[in-house]
């Protein structure tokens, strides 16, 4: 497929986006417009058609995948299990984590250590809730997605060893959820099912 795209002089930005996409992509090449569609979940079978064949994309988007969403921001979390877009189980909540201290000196160091302890306690609690919600579905989960702030999610994943068992089914894109509460879960599953479309002439 790469050689075919190269022959058709696909812009470098498009071929790079396709190469870096964890889910693959589908190229629609018309006489006036071209589109790269990067679906939310991996394309498992390659194909080529001289007609506008949308069946593979249609089939993918109508799969009832079992999804785990784990959304974390400092002081807030939301965890949900979805069958397709239907919520099966969830837990949302808050925890105390102070904002960063900008002043220096010994008091700042004490505050930093105190804040790190708050984060550790918060992450431990969220990890336990993640286990409670995801473990009953662990063997059947198709994909796991994370949402929130990148640094917070990375720190949380390092501490929550339970989630490592889902690494093989974890998608690398980060859902942009500002408030991981009940409404945030609804936003999260909509974003989880969203495709990225790039058009060029």
Task: Indicate residue ranges for each PLM-predicted region.
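Terminal alpha-helical anchor/extension segments at protein ends
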Residues: 1-201
């Amino acid at each position: 497929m790469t050689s075919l795209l190269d022959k058709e002089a696909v812009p470098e930005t498009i071929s790079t986006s396709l190469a870096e996409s964890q889910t693959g992509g589908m190229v629609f090449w018309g006489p006036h417009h071209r589109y790269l569609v990067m679906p939310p979940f991996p394309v498992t079978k390659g194909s080529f058609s001289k007609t506008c064949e949308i069946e593979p994309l249609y089939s993918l988007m109508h799969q009832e995948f079992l999804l785990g969403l784990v959304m974390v921001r400092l002081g807030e979390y939301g965890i949900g299990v979805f069958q397709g877009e239907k919520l099966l189980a969830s837990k949302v909540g808050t925890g105390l984590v102070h904002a960063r201290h900008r002043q220096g000196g010994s008091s700042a160091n004490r505050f930093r250590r105190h804040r790190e302890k708050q984060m550790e306690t918060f992450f431990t609690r969220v990890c336990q809730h993640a286990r409670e919600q995801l473990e009953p579905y662990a063997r059947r989960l198709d994909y796991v997605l994370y949402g929130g702030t990148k640094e917070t999610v990375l720190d949380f994943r390092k501490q929550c060893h339970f989630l490592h068992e889902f690494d093989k089914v974890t998608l690398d894109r980060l859902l942009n959820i500002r408030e991981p509460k009940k409404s945030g879960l609804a936003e999260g599953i909509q974003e989880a099912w969203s495709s990225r479309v790039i058009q060029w002439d």
